[in-house]
Amino acid sequence: MSMSFSFQVEATQGAARAGRMITPHGEVETPVFMPVGTVATVKGIPQDLLEELGVQILLNNTYHLYLRPGVEQIRKLGGTHKFMSWDRSILTDSGGFQVFSLSELRKVTEEGVSFRSHLDGSSHLFSPESAMASQIGIGADIIMAFDECTEYPAERTRTERSMELTLRWAERSKNAFEAHKHEVPWFAERGKKSQALFGIVQGGMFPNLRKESAERTVEIGFPGYALGGFSVGEPREKTAELVANTVPLLPENKPRYLMGVGYPEEIVQYARMGIDMMDCVLPTRAARHGLLFTSEGRLTIKNQRFASDEGPLDPNCSCKVCKRYSRAYLRHLYASNEVLAQVLNTTHNLSYYLDTMRRVRQAIILGENSVSLPVVRSPHLSAT
């Protein structure tokens, strides 16, 4: 089998790294922000526009695609790349976080998680083996080990039990993947390349459990490592502290993925800490609620003060929305509940996130003597 996945660090600045991942569907320059395309669509944005925005890799959600249209349907259609007509890289999560979110509808055992569908109430079981089978059938380039996401707050004994379970599931995920990785829908046409399975570090809000989880997950051995179990209601300062302590425990020659985080100023901060990959629904979800990120701060576009504002959304942004439309028009669309409001707002927010990451990467490559990393001030985060 030819090399399916590689990662190389090309430049560093302090703990921050600029790198390059190669997957069966192309190159990804890191640090990278990955838009979330939950059900094989980034809400409101067609694939050609995602390409135009410079999206290199996006997420699909295993839980949602498993329920609808179903893994077998996607597999028969050639995998998710063909299904959604996207020839660049894709990452799927394992479904663990979504099942965790169904707290009323799920039951966790050693075998896996039994749950009821939020669509029709039908019963299902996700186990490490079935999560691997689903992710292999969907056919993303990067897939995730099946894990249990610990709720917040959680007692230490509960968190430790959960961490131990996740480690056992990581072993089972790896074994199941190794046995079936040649079954990915595009295996033959991509020169017998397969997917890359990442391990997930858990351990809740306890630094010593995070350390143990990181060390033991690295011992199992994966081509990349994710930090999971954040964005579950904990204070952002706590997240930052735990990430800063955990990153140095991960191999320097493997990509590090922080799952489900965060605001623009946070993704800058985490890139500074040495995180290579991040995803978050925030730019798309906030856009649908009229919250827009700009170089001048956050704007709530429905505010009356924008009703006569002829200026662009962000004078420092070169996206097609800022080049063409006024704040007054964007406010009108949002107030009128027009679908175009969602499309334009999301286009701008994604552009802002992607551009922020490009600037961070460029700053790392140029080195600290020429450019400092972009500083985005926020009352929530102390400078690092």
Curated annotation (Swiss-Prot):
Its EC number is 2.4.2.29. It catalyses: 7-aminomethyl-7-carbaguanine + guanosine(34) in tRNA = 7-aminomethyl-7-carbaguanosine(34) in tRNA + guanine. Substrate binds at D93, S94, G95, G96, F97, D147, Q202, G229. One of its GO terms (biological process) is tRNA wobble guanine modification. Residues 260-266, 284-288 are annotated as: RNA binding. Keywords: Glycosyltransferase, Metal-binding, Queuosine biosynthesis, Transferase, tRNA processing, Zinc. Zn(2+) binds at C317, C319, C322, H348. Pathway: tRNA modification; tRNA-queuosine biosynthesis. Belongs to the queuine tRNA-ribosyltransferase family. Catalyzes the base-exchange of a guanine (G) residue with the queuine precursor 7-aminomethyl-7-deazaguanine (PreQ1) at position 34 (anticodon wobble position) in tRNAs with GU(N) anticodons (tRNA-Asp, -Asn, -His and -Tyr). Catalysis occurs through a double-displacement mechanism. The nucleophile active site attacks the C1' of nucleotide 34 to detach the guanine base from the RNA, forming a covalent enzyme-RNA intermediate. The proton acceptor active site deprotonates the incoming PreQ1, allowing a nucleophilic attack on the C1' of the ribose to form the product. This is Queuine tRNA-ribosyltransferase. The lineage of its organism: Bacteria, Pseudomonadati, Acidobacteriota, Terriglobia, Terriglobales.
